[in-house]
């Protein structure tokens, strides 16, 4: 099997790197002729009896994990899935998530990595946009039973198959019998194939699927594992959703497995639960978003749990304040690593040997020597060190375009392939970045990205809503919360009724506005557009007055 420099976008609807860049990254050794399934097989051959995964009920060796993945791959193939198919994968943290991912990787079936918090509004949208052949779910996801939703997906034609980890009745299919198939040895996936689709928070209601290919995503994982010091002694705790790019591949679950370490699976990230797991399993590494990091800090100051095994806490998803950053080492007893990353590609890490001022006050520098970063002004001109501009990037693991969105890609990517992130950053003379905010109409609620337009469109569809606009409001714990300003029709609905309506629409709970205000009109700009800037300023002043 040989990686080809030929762009496959004509057959998979996703822009690939131009041939010259493919050759550059192959020659540099960044990209290898290997799929994720083959990489796992390499780890299993190296340490077959070592424990790869554990949760409260189960411990799997590398050999057992590989065998179960291969059996499931064979069963899924018998069920009708084949190379090039797309499925929506909607599972909670668990060993089943890892097994299903690698089984799909082996078949060359591309999972859309939905989050546990997603509900019918999002899942149906993913299925239809990606023309998914199947939905793969569980009998229970964070207290939610997705099986009625899965039946509706089938009835509406959003997908053709619905496969469930757990109990299932027709027309749903249980996945357990598929593990009885004879293990599939061959790997259908090629290094240049799309391995999976990550999800972009975006700024609109249209799903934006991020095509991550085996060769570049594996480089992302391996280079991250090297920078973060992951090895066979690493014990990695999954508190954040495993489908997240951060938890999955930065270096995350897959980085741990490829380094022959052990993954401790948790469906919860609260301090009480995780502290007990850290003590019991001697966890060495984990990753959090800033709000959870602050909860851990507060809990440990009052509890003094045994966290003596913990060596590294990664914090990313949004900016961690320097005051909280300064507390990590004295309170948790471990090193802090700040992370700035995006599912589209670029990852920046503070390095393990960085001086404290770098770790406390920056979000790190790019992972790869071939990451090309430009910080530009509104006219696209590069700004100087310390000046704020938009972060743009291209490199060996940053995508060249979203799946099936050519018009959006023309705006989101420059003609020479730089991704316009929408992040406002400053950069020092050594290439370290500091996040200053966002250009795009997107809200970052504790690391979860919310497209304002998606929520606005649902609100405007309510018969008692004339118009709606959604903005971020500052929050000391989450960084940002959401506030919806609504111009009602009479009789005016209550804020509670509107929240209930959004839940009934199947909107993920984290996207439902924290606050809804009914107003007679919106402030306007000089050209008659809604002035979200004025609304954000109004909220800021109000919150400051209350403080």
Curated annotation (Swiss-Prot):
<dbReference type="Pfam" id="PF13193">
    <property type="entry name" value="AMP-binding_C"/>
</dbReference>
<comment type="similarity">
    <text>Belongs to the ATP-dependent AMP-binding enzyme family.</text>
</comment>
<keyword id="KW-0436">Ligase</keyword>
<comment type="function">
    <text>Involved in the biosynthesis of the siderophore pyochelin. Specifically adenylates salicylate and loads it onto the holo form of PchE via a thioester linkage to the phosphopanthetheine moiety. Is also involved in the synthesis of the antifungal antibiotic dihydroaeruginoic acid (Dha or hydroxyphenyl-thiazolinyl-carboxylate), a precursor of pyochelin.</text>
</comment>
<comment type="pathway">
    <text>Siderophore biosynthesis.</text>
</comment>
<keyword id="KW-0045">Antibiotic biosynthesis</keyword>
<dbReference type="Pfam" id="PF00501">
    <property type="entry name" value="AMP-binding"/>
</dbReference>
<dbReference type="InterPro" id="IPR020845">
    <property type="entry name" value="AMP-binding_CS"/>
</dbReference>
<comment type="pathway">
    <text>Antifungal biosynthesis.</text>
</comment>
<dbReference type="InterPro" id="IPR050237">
    <property type="entry name" value="ATP-dep_AMP-bd_enzyme"/>
</dbReference>
<dbReference type="InterPro" id="IPR000873">
    <property type="entry name" value="AMP-dep_synth/lig_dom"/>
</dbReference>
<protein>
    <recommendedName>
        <fullName>Pyochelin synthase PchD</fullName>
        <ecNumber>6.2.1.61</ecNumber>
    </recommendedName>
</protein>
<dbReference type="InterPro" id="IPR025110">
    <property type="entry name" value="AMP-bd_C"/>
</dbReference>
<dbReference type="InterPro" id="IPR045851">
    <property type="entry name" value="AMP-bd_C_sf"/>
</dbReference>
<dbReference type="GO" id="GO:0017000">
    <property type="term" value="P:antibiotic biosynthetic process"/>
</dbReference>
<dbReference type="GO" id="GO:0016878">
    <property type="term" value="F:acid-thiol ligase activity"/>
</dbReference>
């Amino acid at each position: 099997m040989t990686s080809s420099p030929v762009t496959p976008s004509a057959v998979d609807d996703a822009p690939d790197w131009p041939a010259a860049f493919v050759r550059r990254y192959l020659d540099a050794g960044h990209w290898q002729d290997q799929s994720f399934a083959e990489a796992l097989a390499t780890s299993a051959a190296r340490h077959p009896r070592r424990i790869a995964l554990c949760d409260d009920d189960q411990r799997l060796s590398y050999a057992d994990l590989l065998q179960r993945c291969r059996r499931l791959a064979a069963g899924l193939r018998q069920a009708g899935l084949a190379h090039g198919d797309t499925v929506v994968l909607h599972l909670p943290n668990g060993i089943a998530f890892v097994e299903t991912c690698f089984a799909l990787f082996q078949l060359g079936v591309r999972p859309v990595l939905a989050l546990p918090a997603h509900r019918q509004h999002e899942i149906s949208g993913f299925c239809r946009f990606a023309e998914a052949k199947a939905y793969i779910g569980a009998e229970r996801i964070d207290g939610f039973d997705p099986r009625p939703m899965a039946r509706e997906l089938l009835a509406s034609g959003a997908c053709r198959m619905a496969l469930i980890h757990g109990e299932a009745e027709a027309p749903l299919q249980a996945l357990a019998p598929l593990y009885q198939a004879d293990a599939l040895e061959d790997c259908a996936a090629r290094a240049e194939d799309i391995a999976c689709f990550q999800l972009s928070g975006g700024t609109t209601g249209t799903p934006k699927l991020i095509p991550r290919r085996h060769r570049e995503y594996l480089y992302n994982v391996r280079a991250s594992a090297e920078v973060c010091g992951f090895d066979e002694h690493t014990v990695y705790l999954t508190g954040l959703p495993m489908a997240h790019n951060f938890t999955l591949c930065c270096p995350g679950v897959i980085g741990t497995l490829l380094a022959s370490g052990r993954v401790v699976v948790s469906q919860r990230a609260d301090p009480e639960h995780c502290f007990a797991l850290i003590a019991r399993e001697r966890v060495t590494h984990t990753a959090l978003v800033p709000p959870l990091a602050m909860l851990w800090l507060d809990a440990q100051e009052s509890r003094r749990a045994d966290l003596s095994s913990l060596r590294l806490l990664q914090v990313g998803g949004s900016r961690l304040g320097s005051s909280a950053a300064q507390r990590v080492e004295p309170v948790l007893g471990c090193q802090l690593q700040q992370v700035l990353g995006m599912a589209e590609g670029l990852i920046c890490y503070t390095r393990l040997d960085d001086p404290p001022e770098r770790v406390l006050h920056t979000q790190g520098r790019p992972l790869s020597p071939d990451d090309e970063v430009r910080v530009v002004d509104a006219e696209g001109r590069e700004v100087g060190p310390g000046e704020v501009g938009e972060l743009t990037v291209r490199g060996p693991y940053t995508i060249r375009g979203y799946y099936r969105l050519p018009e959006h890609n023309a705006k989101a990517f420059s003609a020479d392939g730089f991704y316009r992130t929408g992040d406002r950053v400053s950069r020092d003379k050594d290439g370290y970045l500091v996040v200053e905010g966002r250009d795009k109409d997107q809200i970052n609620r504790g690391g979860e990205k919310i497209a304002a337009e998606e929520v606005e469109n649902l609100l405007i569809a309510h018969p008692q809503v004339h118009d709606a606009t959604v903005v971020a409001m500052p929050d000391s714990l989450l960084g940002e919360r959401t506030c919806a300003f609504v111009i009602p029709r009479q009789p005016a609905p209550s804020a509670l009724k509107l929240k209930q309506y959004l839940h009934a629409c199947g909107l993920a709970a984290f996207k439902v506005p924290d606050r809804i205000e009914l107003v007679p009109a919106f402030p306007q700009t000089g050209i008659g557009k809604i002035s979200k800037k004025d609304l954000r300023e109004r909220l800021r002043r109000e919150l400051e007055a209350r403080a």
